[in-house]
C-alpha cells in the first residue's frame, strides 16, 4: 500500500522532514517514489514551515495512497492557512 509520510532529514537538534510517497513496507528514510513537500518544525523568522505540492498530493490520494496521522494533520493545517490567506 502506498503511504504519504514524513522522512527525517536535517542535522543534530535541527529536524527537517520531507513529505514522501512510499510503500508502507519501506523504512522511514528508505527509498520513495516521489517527494511532494517538506516540513520544518523548528522554522524561525522568515523560514517556511510547511510546503506542499497540492497537485501531486491530490493525484496520489486519487490513486489510493493513504496519509499517516501526522501528514493528515499537516495537510489540514496547510488548507486552513491557505484559506485564511
Swiss-Prot record:
Pfam families: Ribosomal_S16. GO terms for biological process: translation. Keywords: Ribonucleoprotein, Ribosomal protein. GO terms for cellular component: cytoplasm; small ribosomal subunit. The keyword Magnesium does not apply. Coiled coil: none annotated. GO terms for molecular function: structural constituent of ribosome. Belongs to the bacterial ribosomal protein bS16 family. NCBIfam families: S16 (TIGR00002). This is Small ribosomal subunit protein bS16. It comes from Pseudomonas syringae pv. tomato (strain ATCC BAA-871 / DC3000).
Amino acid at each position: 500500500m502506498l503511504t504519504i509520510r514524513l522522512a527525517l532529514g536535517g542535522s543534530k537538534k535541527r529536524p527537517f522532514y520531507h513529505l514522501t510517497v512510499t510503500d508502507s513496507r519501506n523504512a522511514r528514510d528508505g527509498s520513495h517514489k516521489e517527494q511532494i513537500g517538506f516540513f520544518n518544525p523548528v522554522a524561525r523568522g522568515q523560514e517556511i514551515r510547511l510546503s506542499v505540492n497540492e497537485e501531486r498530493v491530490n493525484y496520489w490520494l486519487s490513486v489510493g495512497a493513504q496519509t499517516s496521522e501526522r501528514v493528515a494533520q499537516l495537510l489540514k493545517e496547510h488548507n486552513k492557512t491557505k484559506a485564511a490567506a
